[in-house]
Curated annotation (Swiss-Prot):
Gene (name only): mepK
Organism: Escherichia coli (strain K12)
Functional description taken from the UniProt entry: L,D-endopeptidase that cleaves meso-diaminopimelic acid (mDAP)-mDAP cross-links in peptidoglycan. It works in conjunction with other elongation-specific D,D-endopeptidases to make space for efficient incorporation of nascent peptidoglycan strands into the sacculus and thus enable cell wall expansion. In vitro, is able to cleave the mDAP cross-links of soluble muropeptides and of intact peptidoglycan sacculi. Shows a weak D,D-endopeptidase activity.
Positions of Zn(2+) binding: H133, D140, H173
Family affiliation: Belongs to the peptidase M15 family.
Protein name per its UniProtKB record: Peptidoglycan L,D-endopeptidase MepK
Length: 182
């Protein structure tokens, strides 16, 4: 009976190890699963501003840095600021990890007020009426030196929200809404 119990314990231990390995985060999530600082470097192509923000210190979000990012992502046309979903910053940080780059992100559009969104809708069919930009949950961007198609592929692989691909306008859209793509 003792030999049976010893073998049973070994089997249970091996099963536990195998189960633990199966539920470990994939490389796509590794950048978020380890408690380390998360830093984003961005350029705003409309305002000419640049920012380097450590928005997460390994234990939690840094409110002062989030406030700086909220200002950076503001609707520059109406000069309105909205709190941006921190999940969007996590998504962008993770995306850069998948792409193997920390080059500055070139922000084209972040938050848009409803008035600005309606104004843009009047000029373009590609602007959604209920855009995630108006909720502070979306951004349009590119990264110098990284092919848009590669940014799109990496964003799709995360299955973390919406991914829009606009090669003629030279940007990719990501948001923290339901996973979908266009």
């Amino acid at each position: 009976m003792d030999k049976f119990d010893a073998n049973r314990r070994k089997l249970l231990a091996l099963g536990g190890v195998a189960l633990g390995a199966a539920i470990l985060p994939t490389p796509a999530f590794a950048t978020l699963s380890t408690p380390r600082p998360r830093i984003l470097t961005l350029n705003n192509l409309h305002t000419g501003e640049s920012i380097k923000a450590e928005f997460f210190d390994g234990r939690g979000y840094i409110q002062e840095e989030l406030a700086k990012l909220n200002h950076f992502f503001r609707d520059y046309r109406a000069n309105k600021i909205k709190s941006i979903d921190p999940g969007l910053f996590d998504q962008l940080y993770r995306l850069q990890g998948l792409l193997g780059t920390r080059k500055p992100v070139q922000l084209i559009s972040g938050y848009r007020s409803i008035d600005t969104n309606n104004e843009l809708r009047a000029r373009s069919r590609g602007v959604a009426k209920k855009s995630y930009h108006t909720k502070g949950q979306a951004m349009d961007f590119h990264i110098e030196g990284i092919a848009l198609s590669n940014i799109r592929k990496a964003a799709l692989s995360m299955r973390a929200g919406g991914v829009g691909y606009y090669p003629r306008s030279n940007f990719v859209h990501i948001d923290t809404g339901p996973a979908r793509h266009w």
